[in-house]
Curated annotation (Swiss-Prot):
Binds 1 Ca(2+) ion per monomer. Residues 1-55 form the signal peptide. This is Cytochrome c-552. It is an enzyme of class 1 (oxidoreductase). Heme binds at residues 161, 164-165. Pfam families: Cytochrom_C552. Belongs to the cytochrome c-552 family. Pathway: Nitrogen metabolism; nitrate reduction (assimilation).
Length: 538
């Protein structure tokens, strides 16, 4: 039925174009009458099929548990304090500052369409390719998205924006409790969160096991433990219903293989800021697929922002790496993040240790891929490169179509379209861009689960086709000539101008913030003993 109606709409558009092109002025009355009848027919068709999608989103936040302060929970957040006892691990961790991570890749300048896709949202100001763990705190300070706050209660972002950036976060949650941690502005964390992603993010560094050289894996962020419990419930029910074997996913009772992957789910996941206190929450109650998470957001009426052009109620994916990995062949076969990105290697002292320079598996091929695959490095690299190209090609086509849909929706609003007319098309835009972002925001999805990524992108193309078909009917009804002209967004500067972003103003404010505010934060942190200089390299 859906395909049939899409065909009907396309036929209506073609007939309308031909009528405008070939009928003489003597036939204007007939043409207008025929056009009106076509539009009425299309409107009835859309109402019959898409009534369920036209309900206005009303946010109904799910009540989340809030952990109180736990003063007895000790978390040592200063990474340098473990350098002497674990030099191989520490020095390899510091190496995440080297190589490709030294250079910032300005993704929005390489692909200006991103600026339009995130119109009205802070990501439109600046979006960079990810760097090594060593830079987590530096990069969140430097990015234009976090603004230029002057006081602890100033600035555009919530405290939650720190939550993945380092071991000072679980330390603060333990000291303050979740409510006092989340219910604040980002700037409040400036003097406190100064150590980048490191030891205590993954290990119980105060435990006897850790002192004896054992991994002592621990998740100290309460919201992550809750999310894994919710995921365990959702997947256990699905696996039982479909007769599949099930692995326990609740961290504290999970097997070692699951724990080694779930540690990375501290951060490499999709999440949103829930309720008035902007509490970090993982939308896993239904499962981890793009459809599961979309349904979760739609059911509670959650919206990250309203798009500045289309007025669509948008969702912003974060980095659903754990989700996509778990859906792919590596995840299904128990090959974890650690196996590929943190292999066992031998140090200069002859000791075997886990390499903490999180890196591309091809950079340590003999210790990673070659453990399972008998193909050559060149052969496997060619396969991965080919998959990446396939994903990028489809992703680019979806980007292009969604960008056009935003401008077409704006043209419809400008021509007098009503909220009732637009709701279904805007939901399709929401769902199309969500599918694009779910795949685009994933680091290495083309490797972790290319078949999953391509399937999600294909469904995104279906959604944006639905949106543009409905918009074409609305535009025709309101007398807008199609195709709608898209402004020149061929460079980042042109795209920022089209989207009304004064990028130089943003950059100047950030520069002043980095010169005046950040040094104060670091001085306060040093006075508290939270920030220390790294040991001299031997």
């Amino acid at each position: 039925m859906k395909i049939y109606l899409r065909f009907v709409w396309i036929l209506i558009i073609i007939l309308n174009f031909l009528l405008n092109l070939f009928i003489t002025t003597n036939g204007v009355i007939i043409v207008n009458a025929f056009k009106k009848s076509l539009i009425v027919a299309a409107s009835f068709a859309s109402l019959s099929l898409f009534n369920s999608a036209t309900a206005e989103l009303v946010y109904k936040p799910l009540e989340q548990p809030v952990e109180p302060a736990k003063p007895d929970l000790k978390i040592e957040s200063v990474n340098e304090k473990f350098a002497e006892k674990y030099p191989n691990q520490y020095n390899s961790w510091r190496s995440t500052a080297n190589g490709d991570g030294e250079n910032i890749i300005y993704a929005d300048e390489e692909n200006p369409r991103l600026i339009v896709l995130w119109g009205g949202y802070a990501f439109a100001k600046e979006y960079n390719a990810p760097r090594g763990h060593f830079y987590a705190v530096t990069d969140v300070r430097n990015i234009l998205r976090t603004g230029a706050p002057k006081t602890a209660n100033d600035g555009p972002q919530a405290m939650a924006c720190w939550t993945c950036k380092g071991p000072d976060v679980p330390r603060l949650i333990a000291e303050w409790g979740e409510k006092d941690y989340f219910n604040a502005k980002w700037a409040k964390g400036g003097p406190e969160i100064v150590n980048s992603i490191g030891c205590a993010d993954c290990h119980d560094t105060t435990s006897k096991d850790f002192a004896e050289g054992k991994p002592a894996l621990r998740i100290a962020r309460p919201h992550v433990l809750r999310a894994l419990d919710a995921l365990e419930k959702a997947t256990a029910e699905k696996d039982k219903a479909e007769g599949r074997p099930h692995n326990n996913l609740s961290f504290n009772t999970a097997a070692r293989t699951e724990k080694r992957a779930e540690i990375c789910a501290n951060c490499h996941v999709e999440y949103y800021f829930a309720g008035d206190i902007k509490q970090v929450t993982f939308p896993w109650d239904n499962g981890q697929t793009a459809d599961d998470i979309e349904k979760y957001y739609d059911d509670i009426g959650f919206t990250d922002w309203t798009h500045s052009l289309s007025k669509a109620p948008m969702l912003k994916a974060q980095h659903p790496d754990f989700e996509i990995w778990s859906l792919g062949m590596h995840g299904k076969n128990g090959v974890t993040c650690v196996d590929c990105h943190m292999p066992k290697v031998q140090g200069a002292d002859g000791k075997v240790y886990t390499d903490h320079q999180i890196q591309n598996p091809f950079d340590a091929f003999d210790h990673t891929c070659a453990n399972c695959h008998d193909q050559s490095k060149e052969k496997l690299r060619d396969i991965v490169t080919s998959r990446k190209k396939e994903v990028k090609d489809v992703m680019g086509r979806l980007e292009d179509q969604v960008v056009k849909s935003h401008f077409e929706a704006k043209a419809a609003w400008d021509a007098g379209a009503t909220k009732e007319e637009m709701e279904a098309a805007l939901m399709d835009i929401r769902h199309a861009q969500w599918r694009w972002d779910y795949t685009a925001a994933s680091h290495g999805g083309h490797m972790h689960a290319p078949e999953v990524v391509l399937r999600v992108l294909a469904s995104g193309l279906d959604k944006v086709a639905d949106a543009r078909t409905k918009l074409a009917v609305i535009l025709t009804k309101h007398g807008v000539k199609t195709p709608v002209q898209i402004p020149d967004i061929s460079t980042a500067d042109k795209a920022w101008k089209v989207m009304g972003i004064d990028i130089e103003k943003e950059r100047k404010a950030k520069e002043e913030f980095l010169k005046t505010v950040v040094p104060q934060w670091e001085q306060q942190a040093r006075e508290k003993g939270l920030l220390v200089d790294p040991p001299a390299q031997k």
